[in-house]
Amino acid sequence: MKVTAGVDEVGRGSLIGPVYAAAVILNRSINIKLLKDSKLVAKDKRELLSNYIKKNSIWAVGKASVKEIDKINILQASLLAMKRAIKKLKKKPSHILIDGNKVPDLKNYNLKAVIKGDQKIPSISAASIIAKVSRDKFITTLARDNKGYGWDQNFGYGTKQHLKAIKKLGINKHHRKTFSPISKFKSHNI
């Protein structure tokens, strides 16, 4: 029997925190009409959908840390997070569809990249939603302990508010040091 998993990552463009990926094998009972790319779903609905997907699928989340991102670059870190999510699945899929144009290096897996897969393939859309909700929860926790950066609203992306806060407060251990404009700022708080 063919078992397909969808995989997507979130947080590549953020200036802070880990990059997250999720792998999802949908149950046949799930209503795929509800599944869309996480960027197209309102936050409150995204959280409800994440819970619905988790109850009606086999899923796993993987991540790559800020240190890993700075050491191996964001593309390789994204692929590493995907690899970790795939390997954490409780069931090995016979096919894995990955959003984008690159696939992680995984032997003994049938991997296929699908450009804009998060908009075309329900299992990739589901992975997008789970990864986004998981990362957003983590970043919201970071925001409570790192006041002043507005991470609870900008989630670490390079908004005017965030860049202004960096100029005032400096960068800290959660910032990706190799990312522009972070690499241009002197560290105050590390």
Which functions belong to the PLM regions below?
Residues 1-190:
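RNase H-like, Mg2+-dependent phosphodiesterase core
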